[in-house]
Amino acid sequence: SVDSYIIARKISGLSEKTLYLYRMVLKDFFLTVRKAPTDITTNDIRAYLYMYQSKHDISNRTLDSKRNIICGFFNWLAAEEYICKNPAVNIKPIKYERKHKKAMTQLDLEKIRAACETKREKAIVEVLYSTGCRVSELEHLNISDVNFETKEVVLFGKGNRHRVSYLNAKAEVALKEYLNERSDDNKALFVYDKKPYGRLKKPGIEQIVKKIMER
């Protein structure tokens, strides 16, 4: 059933990186719980999340991304009628504090927003601020790494380490406006504004941010 779920998610447009993340999380879950999907209970999911956090000392934010993947799988099983009772229904989101860089005040942010001259510049600023991602992570983002329904953004750093962050309302609007004005078919989230519209690299992003800051 995990394979069927991965295929379904691939058809829906998720990237290979995201699919790999889903597969690894679900694989670890079932290796730990050692039960068939039809036998999983709500308590099994809660116990797994509790034990995983205790063992790996991860933040609530990271734990919630795992919860979301596991619950998404069982929601799909229920929707496809593979299971009669959905054990994920009563698993609530895990609360965590969404931190932003302390160095930037709200006034600083508004000045930067006002200095943006293009939809691409605005989208870059809003995504960087909303997700707290590094420029190197932004460079490697594909459009399919962004889920506008859940506002999730799957970020991959060094050593293929992953984390899930989120778009706030301003970032979502800015990103959609930027993507809607693009005429290319590049899978990259951000591209150069001249042909052949290749993936916007780290030096290019840094140069754009520098110009905005200097205005």
Where are these regions (language model features)?
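Conserved catalytic core of the tyrosine transesterase superfamily
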Residues: 1-215
